[in-house]
């Protein structure tokens, strides 16, 4: 978990500030020079290497995405509690389960916290979320939390202690209806699954060049914002919070388009991607994609 202050973000894009561990239980939780800060919690491999972003106010906190597995959601809960803040709001960026199945753990700890999403995302989850959770829970058992809750449609903006953060309109990435969050106070963007940094991406919903081009267009729009700090939806260990994630995704999607055009079988498609990108974390994502497209 990397803690970034406004001052350090503006002076050194994406650099972690300070090196003081909160305690031995959280060796990756680094204090900032200022309490006006945000931090990023990254899941382990079983949790899909997914990022949750925590914005820290003086007394309260805002969380963007809530993890997938029960162990990672519990670690996230413990990490938030260690900051001394009260979790005020949980915002969900899109309907993929690895970004919201952990809400039950967090709502148990902070029952008064608001759980919200862009109306388009909230509508999708109201329709499909509980069934999706029940199906996965039956297969995964104790690896998932015991309960799930649907977010309410966001109205009136995303705020914390007088600061307002911009929820962008839905964009196309590894799925439709992804809603990044712009944190202008930190010159930062929580890109969710529009950006993977250093890992394979979820390409199951990108079966052709047209869908890859739609994602590339979204990446171009993010790039044009010129934001210094870009928090990916998933990251490899040590991957930065910066535009390197956009570049990684652009390279990956161009390789995917080429491989789709030049291969006929799942094995050949996978081999072409590994040749183009090398071995990356999140191999499960690639395996699912090649079998969905060529299986």
Region roles according to the model:
Residues 155-186:
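Core dinuclear metal-dependent hydrolase active-site scaffold
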């Amino acid at each position: 978990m990397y803690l970034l202050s406004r001052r350090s973000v503006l002076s050194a894009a994406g650099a972690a500030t300070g090196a003081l561990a909160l305690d031995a239980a959280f060796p990756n939780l680094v204090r900032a020079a200022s309490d006006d800060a945000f931090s990023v919690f990254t899941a382990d491999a079983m949790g899909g290497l997914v990022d949750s972003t925590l914005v820290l106010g003086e007394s309260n906190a805002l969380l963007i995405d809530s993890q997938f597995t029960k162990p990672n959601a519990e670690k996230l809960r413990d990490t938030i509690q260690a900051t001394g803040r009260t979790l005020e709001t949980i915002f969900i960026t899109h309907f993929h389960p690895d970004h919201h199945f952990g809400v039950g753990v967090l709502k148990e700890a902070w029952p008064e916290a608001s759980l919200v999403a862009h109306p388009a995302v909230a509508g999708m989850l109201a329709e499909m979320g509980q069934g999706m959770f029940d199906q996965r829970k039956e297969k995964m058992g104790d690896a998932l939390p015991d309960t799930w809750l649907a977010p309410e449609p966001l109205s009136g903006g995303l705020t914390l202690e007088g600061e307002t953060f911009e929820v962008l309109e839905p964009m196309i990435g590894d799925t439709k209806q992804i809603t990044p969050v712009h944190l202008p106070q930190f010159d930062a963007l929580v890109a969710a699954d529009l950006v993977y940094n250093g890992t394979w991406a979820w390409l199951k919903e990108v079966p052709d060049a047209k869908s890859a081009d739609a994602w590339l267009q979204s990446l171009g729009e993010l790039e044009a914002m010129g934001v210094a700090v870009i928090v990916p939806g998933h990251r490899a260990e040590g991957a930065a919070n910066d535009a390197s994630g956009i570049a990684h995704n652009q390279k990956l999607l161009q390789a995917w388009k080429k491989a789709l055009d030049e291969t006929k079988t799942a094995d050949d498609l996978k081999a072409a991607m590994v040749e183009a990108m090398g071995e990356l974390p999140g191999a499960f994502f690639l395996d699912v994609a090649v079998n969905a497209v060529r299986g």
